[in-house]
Amino acid sequence: MDLEVVVITGMSGSGKSVALHALEDAGYYCVDNLPPELLTSFVELEHAHHGHRVAVAMDVRSATALPLVPQQLAGLREQGVQVRQLFLDATNDVLVRRFSETRRRHPLSQAEMREGPRPLLHTMRLERELLAPLREQAHVIDTSTLRSSQLLSYVKDLLSVPPSRLTLVFQSFAFKRGISMDADYVFDVRMLPNPHYEPLLRALTGKDAPVIDYLRQQPEVALMLAHIGDFLDHWLDALAHNHRSYVTVAIGCTGGQHRSVYLVEQLAARFEGRWNTLRRHRELDGI
């Protein structure tokens, strides 16, 4: 079946509508809040009308039917449909702030209870429990530090690569700002020599030639690159065979400016051609 389906789920307030707008801009036929029990019939109907790219968003308001989604997606894959799953998430404090700023109520906050509306943190905890099976199957996007324009850009980048191959997302980050929630693998490179302590390199980044030359001369850096690359070489085929569309490899150093950026650039270059690759520098790009 010549059809690609993108299913967007995630926490309320995480940016699902923004992600859906990105897909609409990219030419997908989009439906928001589709009841899960209608997913298969909707996809088949759209294909009958010669549609080739479809995107649907689902949220916790359809909680009773959400357990049907994994089985339906498996059935679509058996028919030859290219299925991609995105799960948008953010830290609880960010979600609370967004609800406060927009003055919107959480979809589960008005569930009928004798003691009245549920507290926001309680409903968020319940929502995470209900959505956990879908999160496990999807590519997670942590929107905690993303502006709407950055989320739009990132989703478009993800969907710009062919769905038939595994996509590797290499991301640099600063440990002092926290580990991103969307990482599948996290490598700590803070033990490597730090260009920050070289006065002429401090203001530069891991993409600048002087920093690249400095790090290339460090045996520990070369060894770390080899070990991470060999680990990925060993396991990526198995991940691809397990219907994984995306794998996010996060490389962290103290400031997210020199060492992690350099390693991300080198690893992405190593795997380009064999796999789809994307590069994200969280601290440099403001994401």
Curated annotation (Swiss-Prot):
UniProt keyword annotation of ATP-binding present: yes
InterPro entries, A to Z: P-loop_NTPase (IPR027417), RapZ-like (IPR005337), RapZ-like_N (IPR053930), RapZ_C (IPR053931)
One example GO MF annotation: ATP binding
Binding site for GTP: D59, V60, R61, S62
Gene3D superfamilies reported in the protein's UniProt record: P-loop containing nucleotide triphosphate hydrolases
Pfam families: PapZ_C, RapZ-like_N
Residues given in the record as ATP binding sites: G10, M11, S12, G13, S14, G15, K16, S17
Keyword list, A-Z: ATP-binding, GTP-binding, Nucleotide-binding
Keyword flag Glycosyltransferase: no
Family assignment from sequence similarity: Belongs to the RapZ-like family.
Protein purpose: Displays ATPase and GTPase activities.
PANTHER family: RNASE ADAPTER PROTEIN RAPZ
Protein name: Nucleotide-binding protein Dtpsy_0831
Organism: Acidovorax ebreus (strain TPSY) (Diaphorobacter sp. (strain TPSY))
